[in-house]
């Protein structure tokens, strides 16, 4: 009987830990999925600005 109670306690503890970790990783994933596209857009804009700057320099060269 004591062994069954211990197994039940271990099962519930494991269940709680798994649910908490799933919630934490789920929130981190959703946050990351929102931030990554923003970061990629920032880098692509910098590249576009650099290309436009080079085009202007080429036009202005005598």
Curated annotation (Swiss-Prot):
Residues 49-62 form a propeptide. Coiled coil: none annotated. The keyword Chloroplast does not apply. Keywords: Antibiotic, Antimicrobial, Cytolysis, Fungicide, Hemolysis, Membrane, Secreted, Signal, Target cell membrane, Target membrane, Toxin. The keyword Nucleotide-binding does not apply. It comes from the Eukaryota. One of its GO terms (molecular function) is toxin activity. Expressed by the venom gland. GO terms for biological process: defense response to bacterium; defense response to fungus; killing of cells of another organism. Residues 1-23 form the signal peptide. It is found in: Secreted; Target cell membrane. Its main location: secreted. Belongs to the non-disulfide-bridged peptide (NDBP) superfamily. Medium-length antimicrobial peptide (group 3) family. Ponericin-W subfamily. Antimicrobial peptide with potent activity against a range of Gram-positive and Gram-negative bacteria. Has high hemolytic activity against erythrocytes. May act by disrupting the integrity of the bacterial cell membrane. This is Ponericin-W-like 32.2. It comes from Lychas mucronatus (Chinese swimming scorpion). The lineage of its organism: Eukaryota, Metazoa, Ecdysozoa, Arthropoda, Chelicerata.
């Amino acid at each position: 009987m004591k062994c069954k109670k211990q197994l039940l306690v271990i099962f519930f503890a494991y269940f709680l830990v798994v649910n908490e970790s799933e919630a934490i990783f789920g929130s981190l994933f959703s946050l990351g999925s929102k931030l990554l596209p923003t970061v990629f857009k920032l880098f692509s804009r910098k590249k576009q600005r650099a290309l436009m700057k080079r085009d202007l320099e080429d036009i202005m060269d005598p």
